Amino acid sequence: MIILVPLLFAVSFFYSTVGLAGGSSYIAILVLVGVNLFTIPPVSLALNIVVASIALFNYLRAGHLSLRISIPLLISVPFAFIGGSTILPEKTLIIIFVIALFSASAMLLLSGNQIKNRQEKIRKLNLSLSRLSLITLPLGAILGTVSGLVGIGGGIWLSPILILTGVANPKTAAASASLFILTNSISGLFAHSITQEVDFALILPLAFVVLLGGFLGSRLGAFKLSHEKLIFIIGIIVAVAGINLATRLFN
């Protein structure tokens, strides 16, 4: 199990540079090292909580969190609980998610300049909270349910959607994603703790590893990296997440 240390550190570092926590990759890694499948979702959610907390702290300090965008997304919390307490066949959902992730990744990597132009137009429109809520409320509800069901925070879908629709620039999207992941993961973990036993003996040592990786990565993303580099990194990470989720089809 010592192999978990460098793998989880790397995942938490790279994902946190863009405000993500790495839940989909934690799942893939834990599957590969032979952790019991029923144990994995709450462990992944717990690690998400650690990384998303420190990522949110760094992006908040850097002034990138937009409450106009983030507050309506918090409707996801009760839906994450519903998803986390629901037992459904996952394979069909995973196929849809993998297609969505690869599509988002391709759009991010191939249309960087168009994204920047779209974001500038949205910024000039200065949409009211009520109009933004028409996008963020249903988005939060859908992604909250999905994230609780699958056992990840949901930011891996949220970030590309916010960027591709022009609602947020990459750093604002990263800050919103970290808050979204944190609240959903807490809700999902609570739901899992009601329906099954949570392996805190496994979680605690791994939490220290991802705490360090998450702190260093999110600090780099919040204060150092440019928007263009963040779009590229998000595109790559979303593609990797798609590959990792696809591995669940064979386990």
Positions of PLM-derived features:
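Residue positions within transmembrane alpha-helices of multi-pass solute transporters
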Residues: 21-22, 53, 79, 186, ...
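Short hydrophobic/aromatic, small-residue-rich stretches within specific transmembrane helices
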Residues: 44-48, 177-181, 203-207
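Transmembrane helix boundary and interhelical junction motifs in multipass membrane proteins
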Residues: 18-26, 151-159
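Short, structured loop/turn "capping" segments at alpha-beta junctions
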Residues: 116, 152-157, 168-172
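Juxtamembrane transmembrane-helix boundary motif
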Residues: 1-16, 27-33, 37, 57-145, ...
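Transmembrane alpha-helices of multi-pass small-molecule transport proteins
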Residues: 43-58
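Membrane-interface alpha-helices at helix entry/exit sites of multi-pass transporters
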Residues: 36-46, 167-178
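Hydrophobic alpha-helical transmembrane segments of multi-pass integral membrane proteins
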Residues: 172-188, 240
